Amino acid sequence: MQTLETPKPLTNTSPEFDTTIHRRQTRPVKVGDITIGGGYPVVVQSMINEDTLDIEGSVAGIRRLHEIGCEIVRVTVPSMAHAKALAEINQKLAEVYRRVPLVADVHHNGLKIALEVAKHVDKVRINPGLYVFEKPSTTRSEYTQAEFDEIGEKISETLKPLVVSLRDQGKAMRIGVNHGSLAERMLFTYGDTPEGMVESALEFIRICESLDFRNLVISLKASRVPVMLAAYRLMVKRMDELGMDYPLHLGVTEAGDGEYGRIKSTAGIATLLAEGIGDTIRVSLTEAPEKEIPVCYSILQALGLRKTMVEYVACPSCGRTLFNLEEVLHKVREATKHLTGLDIAVMGCIVNGPGEMADADYGYVGKQAGYISLYRGREEIKRVPEDQGVQELIELIKADGRWVEP
């Protein structure tokens, strides 16, 4: 169950010494039983890769993601048949599992599809560059203001029925701009730039606001991290100037796979989160969707925004290390990884040990060959033979009443 975050009290209000991440204040947007923004914890999302027409497969994929911590699940809806399949998926989910907050991904000329799927999901994602698709011209090199405005009117008329439907149902919309699919008129007017991405989002926001609909989440994704960072920062600047407080969905699109895909996503998402920007995240990997969820939670844990696992502090090892640090860290982690909320330090020697682990709940430190010292906070509790270290650490945690069985 979601709970509102309580800001940590500042011990030093001087900005250069303030280690607290001060999140941008945003309006709360309900997506099923989950709230994005409004001071709630950063929400984790992903997307199934099953064909939505495969009812059983889609239900299984949604359930797999939700069971490992994916709080909102997105599905692709490229046709009317896919939209209608969402009714069956929802019914089947309720029968075999539970209701899960669902988002429908709607793209090319998607009004009829979006109106149908809005009955069956909690949020509809639209791409401003594709929602009213204009086939690129090979001869055009610019748009006059009149032409620009004429297409804007067409977009408004096409978007209005969906906005009214979502508004009247109390549901949400994500205005999801992608750098790679900006509309031609935006490209000619603003260039292939973060400014074009922001103006594309603002055009759709204004249409929604004109109909008194503000259950909006905004994203401005790009496959290049510097472009993504610039777009979100500019979006925040423009929203602040315009008095807007919409929550932001962060992600680096098409990040790839493996180690680099994870690093690339983290470089973009974590940078913005550290600046207080962002209310929900997705790490997009060219892997099974289940692989994305641990990366999301690791990013949030590393920044101190959500604590969903044990925090381990361990030195990188050097010539002073008095035991096999990598092996011992593995043993400690395997024995204690279920103790969510604890900070445990494993340090190879006395030089850095006590100081670096001062904020940890428990410490495991090499002090002399064949022996290790166990700490509770800054206090050394006992010195024990190395081969008894992990078990003695467990006993210390148990004695403090902080142990739970795996």
UniProtKB/Swiss-Prot annotation:
An annotated GO BP: isopentenyl diphosphate biosynthetic process, methylerythritol 4-phosphate pathway
Gene3D superfamilies: Dihydropteroate synthase-like, Sulfite Reductase Hemoprotein, domain 1
Superkingdom field: Bacteria
Coiled-coil residue spans: none
Catalytic reactions on record: (2E)-4-hydroxy-3-methylbut-2-enyl diphosphate + 2 oxidized [2Fe-2S]-[ferredoxin] + H2O = 2-C-methyl-D-erythritol 2,4-cyclic diphosphate + 2 reduced [2Fe-2S]-[ferredoxin] + H(+)
Cofactor: [4Fe-4S] cluster
Keyword Iron-sulfur attributed: yes
GO molecular function, one term: 4 iron, 4 sulfur cluster binding
E.C. code: 1.17.7.1
Binding-site positions, [4Fe-4S] cluster: C315, C318, C349, E356
UniProt cross-references to InterPro entries, sorted A to Z: Dihydropteroate_synth-like_sf, IspG_bac, IspG_bac-typ, NO2/SO3_Rdtase_4Fe4S_sf
Cofactor binding, note field: Binds 1 [4Fe-4S] cluster.
Pathway the protein takes part in: Isoprenoid biosynthesis; isopentenyl diphosphate biosynthesis via DXP pathway; isopentenyl diphosphate from 1-deoxy-D-xylulose 5-phosphate: step 5/6
Family statement drawn from the similarity comment of this UniProt entry: Belongs to the IspG family.
Function text: Converts 2C-methyl-D-erythritol 2,4-cyclodiphosphate (ME-2,4cPP) into 1-hydroxy-2-methyl-2-(E)-butenyl 4-diphosphate.
Descriptive protein name: 4-hydroxy-3-methylbut-2-en-1-yl diphosphate synthase (ferredoxin)
Organism the protein comes from: Rippkaea orientalis (strain PCC 8801 / RF-1) (Cyanothece sp. (strain PCC 8801))
Phylogenetic classification of the source organism: Bacteria, Bacillati, Cyanobacteriota, Cyanophyceae, Oscillatoriophycideae
Name of the coding gene: ispG
